[in-house]
Structure formats: structure tokens, C-alpha cells
């Protein structure tokens, strides 16, 4: 089964996660098919903490990819950020 999940990177005590599309049988930080975004939980100041390529994510979902619990929570958060960033008319 194809799954969209987070792969951990970064240094010790300084996590950085890549949002990847991978086969569920592969290791968390192992081989993946495509990188569709990132999540930086320790972003400070003007650093970007979350970026998702929504077009690629919807493509993989249409192909049957399942989102992990954490990724689905981050997608909802990203949607709220995008909605807040759009100018009100």
C-alpha cells in the first residue's frame, strides 16, 4: 500500500520532517517515491514551518495513497493557513 507519511531528518534535538510518498513496507526514513512537502516543528521567526505541494498530494490520493494521522492533521492546518493568507473580499 502507498502511504503519505513523515520521514525524520535534521540533527539531534532539532527535528525536521519531509512529507514523502512511500510504500508502507519501507522504513520510515528509507526509500520513498516522491517528496511532497516538509514540516519544521522548531521554525522560528520568519522561517516557513510547513509547505505542502497540494497538487501532488491530491494526485497521490487519487491513486489510492493513504495519509498517516499526522499528515492528515498537517494538511488541515495547511488549509487553514492558506485560507487565512487569502485576502478577504
Curated annotation (Swiss-Prot):
List the InterPro entries hit by this protein, alphabetically.
Ribosomal_bS16, Ribosomal_bS16_CS, Ribosomal_bS16_dom_sf
List keywords of the entry alphabetically: Ribonucleoprotein, Ribosomal protein
Q: Which GO terms describe its biological process?
A: translation
User: Which PROSITE patterns did the record assign?
Assistant: RIBOSOMAL_S16
- A GO-annotated cellular component: cytoplasm
User: What Gene Ontology terms describe what this protein does at the molecular function level?
Assistant: structural constituent of ribosome
Question: Where in the sequence is the signal peptide annotated?
Answer: none
Q: Which cysteines are joined by disulfide bonds?
A: none
Please give the superkingdom of this protein's source.
Answer: Bacteria
* Record flagged with keyword rRNA processing: no
Q: Gene3D superfamilies, from UniProt?
A: 3.30.1320.10
UniProt keyword annotation of Coiled coil present: no
The similarity comment for this entry is: Belongs to the bacterial ribosomal protein bS16 family.
**Which HAMAP family does the UniProt entry name for this protein?**
Ribosomal_bS16
PANTHER family cross-referenced by the UniProt entry: 30S RIBOSOMAL PROTEIN S16 (PTHR12919), SMALL RIBOSOMAL SUBUNIT PROTEIN BS16M (PTHR12919:SF20)
| Record protein name field | Small ribosomal subunit protein bS16
